[in-house]
């Protein structure tokens, strides 16, 4: 039995190391990509990326949409079919498919919550714990703890999600100047990003999606092995 548990512990350690290594690879690629583009230097290590990028405000690339909460005292507003997210539901997963709580059409219409379109929306938490992100895979709404990024038709959501670390860092710097750590939709829309053409956006988004899938795979294996133990 002792030998069996030793094998399981070794498997856990192995997948933890793999997960950490892949996360470091992702972080390093992002930094290298941004530095290469911003310095306008060709980098043979990243042949995927050109230097033909331009500076754009996030608000030019997407609509920034806030959320709201229907009155909790009215049962007609709750337990419906409309996804309604809170920041606590956003973790490290690249995609989200369904929320813990649902609201009704009546609840939606009697609050400042709005329907956000699937596949084009990146949820972005805007209060303490700023910058947790996820791509919607089903239409949804959120509470007021978000400033969601709904990308325009010529912008790839996978690419914008891949830039979320950079967006988060800039958003935190903006929020640090306020009494309560929060970023408004107007402030978020003013954040500057470097962006390539749509085809290159798609290639970059696909690359980082593959990396995130690898991270998720090892995290799932860790969960299963720990559960078996």
Residue spans of the language-model regions?
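Amphipathic alpha-helical segments with low aromatic content
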Residues: 1-54, 199-229
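A short beta-sheet element
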Residues: 80-81, 86-88, 97-165, 184
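Specificity-determining recognition surfaces
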Residues: 70, 163-193
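Non-catalytic DNA-recognition/assembly elements of restriction-modification systems
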Residues: 47-68
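Proline-centric
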Residues: 1, 49, 148-155, 187-202
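Short beta-strand/turn micro-motifs at beta-sheet edges
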Residues: 32, 133-136, 176-181
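Structural detector for helix-capping/boundary residues
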Residues: 44, 56-59, 88, 106, ...
């Amino acid at each position: 039995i002792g030998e069996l548990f030793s094998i399981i512990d070794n498997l856990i350690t192995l997948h933890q190391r793999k997960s950490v290594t892949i996360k470091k690879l992702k972080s390093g690629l992002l930094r290298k990509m941004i530095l290469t583009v911003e310095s306008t230097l060709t980098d043979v290590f990243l042949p995927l990326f050109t230097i033909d990028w331009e500076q754009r405000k996030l608000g030019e690339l997407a609509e920034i949409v806030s959320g709201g909460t229907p009155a909790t005292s009215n049962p007609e507003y709750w337990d419906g079919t409309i996804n309604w997210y809170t920041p606590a539901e956003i973790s490290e997963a690249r995609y989200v498919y369904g929320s813990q709580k649902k609201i009704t059409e009546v609840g939606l219409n009697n609050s400042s919550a709005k329907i956000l379109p699937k596949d084009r929306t990146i949820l972005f938490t805007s209060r303490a714990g700023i910058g947790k992100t996820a791509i919607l895979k089903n239409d949804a709404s959120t509470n007021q703890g978000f400033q969601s990024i709904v990308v325009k038709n010529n912008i790839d959501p996978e690419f914008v999600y891949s830039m979320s670390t950079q967006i988060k860092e800039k958003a935190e710097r903006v929020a640090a100047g306020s009494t309560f750590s929060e970023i408004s939709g107007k402030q978020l829309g003013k954040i500057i990003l470097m962006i390539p053409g749509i085809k290159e956006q798609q290639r970059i988004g696909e690359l980082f999606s593959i990396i995130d899938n690898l991270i998720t795979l090892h995290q799932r294996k860790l969960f299963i092995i720990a559960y078996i133990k």
